[in-house]
């Protein structure tokens, strides 16, 4: 059976061949002992079995509920009618703008609370989360190990990032995953939330390699001060958080072309254009709340 993504152009039935996928742990000489152990541990939680089942239940019934309680009074969600009906056996990729550390938590927390059964996955910087033992604890407590795989900032370890992208593709292809990525590649610290950073090619590489439906979303209103954010929700005086979902992205013939860094950036730019369009809608929605 052809999946829904193929019918809208998001996932063509014939995909170009790709180079051999890299494995993060193949680069043992570039990883510290702590990084190796923590990557191995978190990776194993994604393997079918008791760990994976336990983490899915924790994300579904604990993580999503505390996010719901901490945001529901000031959160406004639009565009849900554009979303597909989620199939538990398929994987999905959400692409969002990046203003706050908590963007994807709020987006996916909302969906999980409305019966999306998928395992969550958000690539995260390696610094602290994978090179410090405390990072593993925070990853487990804050996200139930959704923060995986690690992304490495050092240019000398660029090959590790390609391996992390390939690991993301591998998990998406397995099915039952919901992955969140930011085409901008880093948090946008500018004053204007509607002025997005340039697209980076890594997201395009994942989109082309995985062949899953890509769901765009624009989110605005979240800060990075967690206590202040939570207090604003309970007093109902915090900045409104607006989440605006779009329909699955149609990439036309981009995904059937031979893979290359230039093509991957085009794919990322196309996804970012959809996010930008949703941002224009969000601006109008926000104005109507005043």
What are these regions (language model features)?
Residues 73, 116-118, 239-241:
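Residue-level signal for beta-strand positions within conserved beta-sheet cores that form or flank
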Residues 73, 89, 144-147, 174-175, ...:
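Structured helix-beta-strand junction loops
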Residues 45-46, 86-157:
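Catalytic core of membrane glycerolipid acyltransferases/transacylases, capturing the structured
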Residues 66-98:
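Helix-to-loop junction immediately C-terminal to a conserved catalytic motif
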Residues 63-67, 112, 139, 169, ...:
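Short amphipathic alpha-helical segments and helix-helix/interface helices
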């Amino acid at each position: 059976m052809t999946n829904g993504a193929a019918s809208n152009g998001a996932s063509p039935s014939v995909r170009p061949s790709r180079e051999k996928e890299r494995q993060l742990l193949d680069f043992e000489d570039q990883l510290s002992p702590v990084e190796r152990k923590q990557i191995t541990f978190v990776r194993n939680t994604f393997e079918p079995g008791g760990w994976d089942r336990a983490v899915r239940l924790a994300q579904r019934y604990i993580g999503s509920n505390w996010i719901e309680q901490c945001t529901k009074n000031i959160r406004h969600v639009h565009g849900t009618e554009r979303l597909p009906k989620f199939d538990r056996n398929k994987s999905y990729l959400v692409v969002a703008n990046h203003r706050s550390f908590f963007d994807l938590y709020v987006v996916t927390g909302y969906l999980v609370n409305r019966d999306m059964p998928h395992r969550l996955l958000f690539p995260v910087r390696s610094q602290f989360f994978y090179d410090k033992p405390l990072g593993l604890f925070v990853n487990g407590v804050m996200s139930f190990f959704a923060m995986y795989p690690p992304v490495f900032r050092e240019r000398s370890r660029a090959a590790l990032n390609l391996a992390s992208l390939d690991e993301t593709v591998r998990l998406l292809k397995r099915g039952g995953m919901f992955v969140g990525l930011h085409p901008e590649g880093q948090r946008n610290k500018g004053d204007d939330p509607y002025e997005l950073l340039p697209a980076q090619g890594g997201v395009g590489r994942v989109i082309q390699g995985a062949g899953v439906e890509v769901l765009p979303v624009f989110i605005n209103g979240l800060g990075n001060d967690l206590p202040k954010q939570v207090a604003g929700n309970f007093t109902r005086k915090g900045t409104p958080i607006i989440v605006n979902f779009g329909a699955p992205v149609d990439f036309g013939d981009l995904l059937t072309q031979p893979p290359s860094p230039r093509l991957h950036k085009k794919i990322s730019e196309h996804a970012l254009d959809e996010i930008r369009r949703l941002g224009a809608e969000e601006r109008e929605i926000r104005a109507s709340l005043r």
